[in-house]
Design a protein with these regions (language model features):
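Amphipathic alpha-helical packing segments from all-alpha helical-bundle domains
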Residues: 111-175, 181, 199-212
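Charged, low-complexity intrinsically disordered regulatory/assembly segments
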Residues: 190-232
Length: 232
């Protein structure tokens, strides 16, 4: 009998772990359950990952890859609408896969093991794609919006300071999204099946306000939001 290639066994284990996480939460991430779901032995988990900390890191990496894939949207001629559409898809991913979302960003752990974190502000715009691909979507959106004259970030600073300001502005959008999502997933904004009210009363006004603070007009920001809702 020909044994399975090592890559396939590893992928099977990772897919099984993600499925268990999505369905049952981080408590289900146990070597026995993962191995059984993948149709292999518990030893395979250690053979292919080294241990649970490495497996949790691999789950996080794969989750972020899938998150990055979900956030990859076609560009339009309205960069602010594209930035907001990214936020809409961001929220959809987090609502659809709350256990993975919490694990990816360190708000929950699996048996006391947390996913590794990255300092987003340590990277410039040229490094973001390789370092943190999912965050890069926000950085590109902010950068395109600045180039289009919709946003203004450190206009009189040096190129290096402006580069850092672009990343920081993207982090402001991420902070709005992540803070909202954590409260929404915890149930503070109503029932899980009511996704409209909290978005229209809380998330949309916060996002438009941030756009205006960064230089956009309320009217253009509202128009871009309407376009983003149609686009995403």
């Amino acid at each position: 009998v020909t044994s399975q290639p090592e890559r396939t066994v590893r992928e099977d284990l990772l897919a099984a772990a993600l499925a268990l996480l999505d369905e049952h939460g981080p408590e289900a991430l146990q070597t026995r359950k993962i191995a059984a779901a993948a149709g292999t032995s518990t030893m395979a988990v250690y053979t292919h990952f080294g241990g649970m900390p490495q497996l949790i890191a691999a789950i996080t990496d794969e989750g972020l890859r899938q998150f990055d894939e979900a956030l990859t949207l076609p560009a339009t001629d309205d960069p602010v609408a594209d930035l907001l559409a990214t936020g809409i898809v961001y929220r959809r991913f987090a609502r659809d896969r709350p256990h993975l979302y919490r694990l990816m960003f360190g708000s929950t752990s699996a048996h006391g093991i947390n996913a590794p974190a990255h300092n987003m502000l340590a990277f410039g715009t040229a490094e973001i794609d390789a370092a943190v691909p999912s965050f890069a979507h926000l950085v590109r959106g902010v950068h395109r919006s600045i180039q289009a004259g919709r946003l203004r970030v450190a206009p009189n600073e040096s190129a290096e300071q402006t580069d850092a300001a672009v990343v920081a502005a993207a982090a402001q959008f991420w902070t709005v999204m992540h803070g909202f999502m954590m409260l929404e997933l915890a149930g503070y904004f109503g029932e899980a099946d009511d996704e409209v009210y909290a978005a229209t009363q809380i998330l949309s006004p916060m996002t438009v306000s941030l756009l205006v603070v960064l230089g956009d007009t309320p009217e253009r920001a509202a128009q871009s939001l309407a376009a983003a809702l149609h686009q995403a």
